Amino acid sequence: MAGKKNNNNGQYIILRTPEQQVEIDQRNARRAQMGRMKKARQPVQRYLQQHGLRNGLSGRGGYIVAPTSGGVVTRPIVPKFSNRGDSTIVRNTEILNNQILAALGAFNTTNSALIAAAPSWLASIADLYSKYRWLSCEIIYIPKCPTTTSGSIAMAFTYDRNDAAPTARAQLSQSYKAINFPPYAGYDGAAYLNSNQGAGSAIAVQLDVTKLDKPWYPTISSAGFGALSVLDQNQFCPASLVVASDGGPATATPAGDLFIKYVIEFIEPINPTMNV
């Protein structure tokens, strides 16, 4: 029974029933949670008050205002190597390929298999090991077209090499974590290439490494991979980058570069002459 009781020191002790104590604990937990949420929102609210809204984030969409002019300067970083037990971990950022807007607004699509041999610098490292896995893999779009360039681009990962190529940008836009953007967007990505901070308003897609089919994939050369059937390619390739564009200008225009920022782990060294 709830009430008060006098202890040996002459102080009153409040007695509560178990039901009352549970209710009080729940109320205190709700108050603490609301306090944490309010505190977590303060930096965001303060930033918006000072700077206003920025270009939309890749992770949740937003808006882009075409700049009157723009340019990007990129510098390569020194690749970083580390070891964990018997494995070798490599961190680097490099150009994967570029995206072209087809002439007269025609639809255009590209498909890049994300095997360890896909990035040109990493390919020579992959030859030295039997197996690999992506610990982190992001594709960052850096524009290089005029800011008046028309068109739209969609970018997404697919997880089955047997999937048919999209025939319209709308099809690719329905893929898991797909992103749509104008070709002139993404200047902020230059600062993200060599940074460990959040992507901010960079145009980027992140590979969900927690949902891949296998824990490890065999390494293979690009030539050997290309000679396989699409079903066999799934044994070596965890995912593919698919990019689609339409609505471009009258003449074919290079829209931008696609950089790959990765952390990859290799195991089981092998002589490269044997690893085909």
Curated annotation (Swiss-Prot):
Major site of localization recorded for this protein: virion
Would you name any one GO CC term?
Answer: T=3 icosahedral viral capsid
Keywords attached to this Swiss-Prot or TrEMBL record, sorted alphabetically, are: Capsid protein, RNA-binding, T=3 icosahedral capsid protein, Virion
**What Pfam families does this protein map onto?**
Viral_coat (PF00729)
Sample GO molecular function, one term:
structural molecule activity
Q: Where is this region: R domain, interaction with RNA?
A: 1-85
InterPro entries reported in the protein's UniProt record: Capsid_prot_S-dom_vir, Viral_coat
Q: Where is this region: P domain, projecting?
A: 267-276
**What are the boundaries of the region S domain, virion shell?**
86-266
Quote the subcellular location field of this record.
Virion
Asked if the keyword Cell wall biogenesis/degradation belongs to this entry, the reply reads no
Q: What does this protein do?
A: Capsid protein self-assembles to form an icosahedral capsid with a T=3 symmetry, about 28 nm in diameter, and consisting of 180 capsid proteins.
Question: Assembly and partners?
Answer: Homomultimer.
Family membership, please give it: Belongs to the icosahedral plant coat protein family.
Q: What protein name applies here?
A: Capsid protein
What is the species listed in this Swiss-Prot or TrEMBL entry?
Tobacco necrosis virus (strain A)
